[in-house]
Regions:
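Conserved nucleotide-binding/hydrolysis modules and their immediate coupling elements
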Residues: 487-527, 535
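Glycine-rich, charged/polar anion/phosphate-binding loops
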Residues: 114, 154-155, 167-168, 178-181, ...
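Structured, non-catalytic alpha/beta "coupling" segments that mediate domain-domain communication
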Residues: 47, 56-64, 305, 404, ...
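Glycine-centered tight beta-turn/hairpin loop motif at sheet-sheet or coil-to-beta transitions
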Residues: 176, 251, 475-481, 500-504, ...
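Catalytic cores of soluble metabolic enzymes centered on carboxylation/carboxyl-transfer
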Residues: 267-503
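N-terminal beta-alpha lobe that positions the nucleotide/phosphoryl donor
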Residues: 1-244, 248-265
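Structured core elements
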Residues: 20, 49, 126, 139-140, ...
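Acidic, low-complexity mobile loops and tails
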Residues: 551-567
Length: 567
């Protein structure tokens, strides 16, 4: 089923049968219980999978599905109610003897009572909306002079966003790690855990990079956390997939919340366990049980996932909408994406472009592969957080796991600052070589033309050799132009590039696979991706993505060729 805004979305194009359930805004489509039920009935469905968001944790929706004679692929409505309210979820954890963060018992909605209890607890204190989830509805109080303002703001947000003014008051753990346990239950008391994930890298309580297993923590501690997660699930005869989230600080762990649905980050668990979690979800819904026991499960290697978003880090990560005129994602890893090149990122829904999931024998290798993969992501038409993710993947503190849930927020300027190029001369010279060699080659054999970059153009005058001292003017993204002269030392292999300043570089350049180049300078080798697209040269380098606009002097073009618009 889909909204009008998603009528041409990838998931609609791929499916055999689809039903439109309303207008673009979620409140007029994906959140309309009656419309979803009617759509399912119209195609004779016997079950509904709620996905990640929208109605996935709504007990009224689960009841409506069952009342219509269909299977709700998730927990029972009663379980959703229990965990949908943070106060009752915390009570369930206490009843199961799972450690919880100290604070006032139960929810509070009276501002004066909240202020008095906060003062008794001592700052810092976290105010949490009882109906919140997924990192939303949390406000940290650190200064008593703003206490009243913070309380009133938290109450307003809880009411407007979650429909309830109830707040939980909890002691704030300033440098905690976020560890969550994936559980699966058959609804009859049999619950297993699929080990843990570490989701410590967050921005304003929103997960950015997730990994499994949790690195650098004692396995005995992680086993205790997993055992408590299973016990909590068993007390409620948990059905389906769910995630029990914890904070870990100072060798202790504390219950945070339960997400009673499949999570965005489930692929890292699939990678280390070898299980298909969606298939397991369907098996449970069919009443076939889990089909496995705890001893069947083992950890294989390390997996890391990064969420690539259409958002602008320079504008406080505001969503960026538009058409994906270019979308090039790397190979050699798992990519989960709901869009393709040419699709639109709309203002209606979460602006995620893709999830990049790397699985490797160890964490060090996984992080290195993730960073390399991010280097080779190319997106045009919208702003993205690619550079931000790359900076995280290569950060030494993160590599040593010397991070906590507020670590990103404290280093945001550093992580989002555009890095200066250390070798702009090298990349400009590389662009000149690639342009000259490609424009002189047979375009039918040119891998770039296979990407429809030059429809209607005839490039080159034929022949393999480059004329001595061929010139090309390159204009960078700052509109700074420079004329370079490319001379062959060994045609097809090594070149001398002279700049306007009289400086010279000797580089080797060889295409390994279509669009993938090996560029050498002395004993140093760089691997880059390159293409000529819409009249510009795009380079994906170890220092980021660079764009140059080339122009070759007409003096090098004969009259017939010029008339034919050859370059």
């Amino acid at each position: 089923m889909h909204s009008q805004a998603d009528a041409n979305a990838l998931h609609v194009r791929e499916i055999g049968k689809s039903v439109c359930i309303g207008a673009g805004p979620a409140s007029e489509s994906y959140l309309k219980i009656d419309a979803v039920i009617a759509a399912a009935q119209s195609v004779g469905a016997d079950a509904i999978h709620p996905g990640y968001g929208f109605l996935a944790e709504n007990p009224d929706f689960a009841r409506a599905v069952e009342a219509a004679g269909m299977i709700f692929m998730g927990p029972t409505p009663e379980t959703l109610e229990r965990f949908g309210d943070k106060a009752s979820a915390k009570e369930a954890a206490v009843a199961a003897s799972v450690p919880v963060i100290s604070g006032a018992e139960g929810a509070r909605s009276d501002p004066e009572q909240i202020a008095e209890e906060v003062r008794q607890m001592g700052l810092p204190v976290l105010l949490k909306a009882v109906g919140g989830g997924g990192g939303r509805g949390q406000r940290l109080v650190t200064d008593e002079t703003t206490l009243v303002e913070d309380i009133e703001g938290a109450l307003r947000e809880a009411k407007s966003t979650f429909g309830s003014e109830g707040l939980l008051l909890e002691r704030f753990l300033p440098e905690a790690r976020h560890v969550e346990v994936q559980i699966a239950g058959d609804g009859k008391g049999h619950v297993v855990h699929l080990f843990e994930r570490d989701c410590t890298l967050q921005r304003r309580h929103q997960k950015v990079i997730e990994e499994a297993p949790a690195w650098g923590l004692p396995r005995t501690l992680l086993d205790d956390i997993a055992r408590d997660a299973v016990r909590l699930g068993e007390t409620l005869d948990y059905r389906g997939l769910g995630t029990v989230e914890f904070l870990v600080a100072g060798g202790e762990y504390f219950f945070l919340e339960v997400n009673p649905r499949i999570q965005v980050e489930h692929p890292v668990t699939e990678a280390i366990t070898g299980l298909d979690l969606v298939a397991l979800h369907l098996r449970i819904a069919e009443g076939a049980g889990l089909g496995l026991v705890q001893d069947d499960l083992t950890i294989n290697g390390h997996a890391v996932e990064a969420r690539l978003y259409a958002e602008d880090p320079a504008m406080q990560f505001a969503p960026s909408t538009g058409t994906l005129s270019t979308l090039s994602l790397p190979s050699g890893l798992r990519i989960d994406s709901g869009v393709e090149e040419g699709d639109a990122v709309t203002p209606y829904y979460d602006p995620m472009i893709a999830k990049l999931i790397v699985h490797a024998p160890d964490r060090e290798t996984a992080l290195a592969r993730l960073a390399t993969a991010l280097d080779h992501v190319a997106v045009e038409g919208v702003e993205t957080n690619r550079a931000f993710l790359t900076a995280l993947a290569r950060n030494h503190e993160f590599e040593r796991m010397q991070v906590h849930t507020r670590w990103i927020d404290g280093r945001l300027d550093e992580l989002t600052q555009a890095p200066g190029l250390t070798r702009p001369d090298l990349w400009k010279a590389t662009a000149a070589i690639l342009f000259v060699t490609q424009s002189r080659s047979d375009t039918n054999a040119n891998p770039w033309t296979n990407r429809d970059a030059f429809t209607g153009w005839r490039l080159g005058l034929g022949g393999d050799a480059i004329e001595a001292g061929q010139r090309v003017t390159l204009t960078d993204s700052d509109e700074v132009s420079e004329e370079l002269r490319v001379s062959p030392v060994k045609p097809g292999a090594k070149y001398t590039i002279h700049s306007e300043k009289g400086e010279a570089l000797i580089l080797s350049a060889r295409e390994l696979t279509p669009g993938r180049w090996r560029v050498g300078e002395g004993d140093t080798v760089h691997l880059i991706d390159a293409r000529l697209h819409a009249g510009v040269i795009e380079l994906d380098t170890p220092e980021g993505r660079l764009v140059f606009r080339p122009a070759a002097p007409l003096a090098f073009v004969g009259g017939d060729a010029a008339a034919d618009r050859a370059v």
